[in-house]
Amino acid sequence: MIASKFGIGQQVRHKLFGYLGVIIDVDPEYSLDKPYIDKIAADDSLRTAPWYHVVMEDEDGKPVHTYLAEAQLGYEAFLEHPEQPTLDELAESIRLQLQAPRLRN
């Protein structure tokens, strides 16, 4: 069983670029059809570690869906980000839905 370091609804930072993001899904290993760089195909430990669907914002504040390896992400220490309130709202909304899911008939 593969354990992931981060959970759905958690805010994270990209280690290299420092971008704030919110995890919206987790894959136990790389699951896209083709690796977007040759290193992923060659480095089995990177490919078989958890990968995350992360929503970030571009320079204009528009949401961007990214697919990142666990090694590319770090913990975010702060819960509030005045410069990116929509990501705070997204994270809170996801966490609330996970705590109290709506039942469908």
Curated annotation (Swiss-Prot):
One Pfam assignment: YccV-like
Subcellular location, record wording: Cytoplasm
Major subcellular location class: cytoplasm
Highest taxon in the source lineage: Bacteria
UniProt-listed InterPro entries: Hemimethylated_DNA-bd_dom, Hemimethylated_DNA-bd_sf, HspQ
GO MF annotation list: DNA binding
Keywords: Cytoplasm, Stress response
GO BP annotations listed: response to heat
SMART domains for this protein: YccV-like (SM00992)
A GO cellular component entry from the record: cytoplasm
Gene3D superfamilies from the UniProt entry: Hemimethylated DNA-binding domain (2.30.30.390)
Function: Involved in the degradation of certain denaturated proteins, including DnaA, during heat shock stress.
Family under the similarity heading: Belongs to the HspQ family.
Protein name: Heat shock protein HspQ
Species of provenance: Baumannia cicadellinicola subsp. Homalodisca coagulata
Gene name tied to this protein: hspQ
